[in-house]
C-alpha cells in the first residue's frame, strides 16, 4: 500500500464527499478538513483518519464517508419528541464537547464526571441527532421527562460482554456498535451487578463512543494493560471521549491517572 500523505487524504476525502451543496475548508494548523452543508459542519481530523487507513485500508475511508453522510442526514431532518420518546437515549461525551450547535442552539445536557458529560440524542436508526433545549420548549416536554425516557430506554439495551484475561486480571468489552456502547457506563443497575460479580478493583473506561471497557484489576500489571488499552482505543475512535479510566466505588465513578507499572490516584 502506497504511503498516504495529508494532501492525498485531503484530496481523497474531498472527492468521495463532493456534492453540489457542499464546501470544504482545510485548516493547516490543526490538520483538519471541514465539510459544510446547508450551514451544518463536520470537522475531520486527517492524521487520525490516516492512522486508521494504515490499519484498516479502504474500510477506514468507507467508515468516514458513512459517518459524514449520516451526520448530515440526521441534521437535516425534523424530529418529533413527544410521541417518540422510545427513541431517546443518553450519550456520553467529553466535557470539552461543544454544548451548542453551529447555529447557536443550546444542547440538552447533564453533568456526569470531571471527564464526561451527558447529552441526549434522538435515535434515527443508523445515526442520531442531539436534542436541543428549544425542542423541549416547542413540544412542552421537561428536562426530567426526557432524562427519564432516555435512561429507561438505555436500561432496555442488551449488554453483551466479551472477556479477556491477562495475568489474572479480567477485562470485559461492550462493542455492539449501536452508537450507545459508552452510554452503558450510565446504566447504574448494570454497574452494580458487575461490582457484585467481579473480584479486585472495578475500573471502567470509555475511550470512545463505540466501546466500554470494564476491568477487574488485581495488580499493577492490570493497571498497565488497561492504560495502554485505553490509549489505543482513544487514538483509534471516530468520536474520542476520554483516555482516563474510572474507579467504581460505592456507586460512584472517580477518574484516575495511570502510568505504566504504577497507579496514581486522583
Curated annotation (Swiss-Prot):
It holds the Pfam family DUF1444. It comes from the Bacteria. NCBIfam families: PRK13668.1. Belongs to the UPF0354 family. This is UPF0354 protein lin1649.
Amino acid at each position: 500500500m502506497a504511503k498516504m500523505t495529508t494532501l492525498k487524504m485531503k484530496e481523497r476525502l474531498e472527492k468521495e464527499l463532493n456534492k453540489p451543496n457542499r464546501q470544504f475548508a482545510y485548516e493547516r494548523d490543526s490538520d483538519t478538513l471541514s465539510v459544510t452543508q446547508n450551514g451544518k459542519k463536520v470537522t475531520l481530523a486527517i492524521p487520525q483518519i490516516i492512522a486508521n487507513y494504515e490499519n484498516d485500508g479502504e474500510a477506514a475511508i468507507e467508515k468516514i464517508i458513512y459517518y459524514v453522510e449520516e451526520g448530515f442526514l440526521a441534521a437535516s431532518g425534523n424530529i418529533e419528541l413527544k410521541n417518540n420518546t422510545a427513541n431517546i437515549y443518553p450519550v456520553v461525551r467529553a466535557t470539552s464537547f461543544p454544548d451548542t450547535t453551529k447555529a447557536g442552539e443550546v444542547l440538552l445536557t447533564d453533568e456526569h464526571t470531571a471527564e464526561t458529560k451527558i447529552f441526549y440524542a434522538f435515535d434515527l436508526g443508523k445515526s442520531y441527532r442531539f436534542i436541543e433545549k428549544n425542542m423541549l420548549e416547542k413540544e412542552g416536554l421537561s428536562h426530567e421527562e426526557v432524562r427519564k425516557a432516555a435512561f429507561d430506554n438505555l436500561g432496555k439495551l442488551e449488554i453483551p460482554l466479551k472477556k479477556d484475561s491477562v495475568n489474572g486480571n479480567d477485562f470485559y468489552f461492550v462493542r455492539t456498535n449501536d452508537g450507545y456502547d459508552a452510554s452503558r457506563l450510565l446504566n447504574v443497575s448494570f454497574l452494580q451487578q458487575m461490582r457484585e460479580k467481579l473480584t479486585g478493583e472495578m475500573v471502567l473506561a470509555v475511550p470512545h463512543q463505540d466501546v466500554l471497557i470494564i476491568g477487574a484489576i488485581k495488580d499493577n500489571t492490570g493497571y498497565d494493560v488497561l492504560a495502554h488499552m485505553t490509549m489505543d482505543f482513544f487514538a483509534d475512535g471516530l468520536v474520542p471521549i476520554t483516555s482516563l479510566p474510572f474507579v467504581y466505588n460505592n456507586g460512584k465513578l472517580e477518574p484516575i491517572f495511570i502510568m505504566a507499572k504504577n497507579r496514581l490516584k486522583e
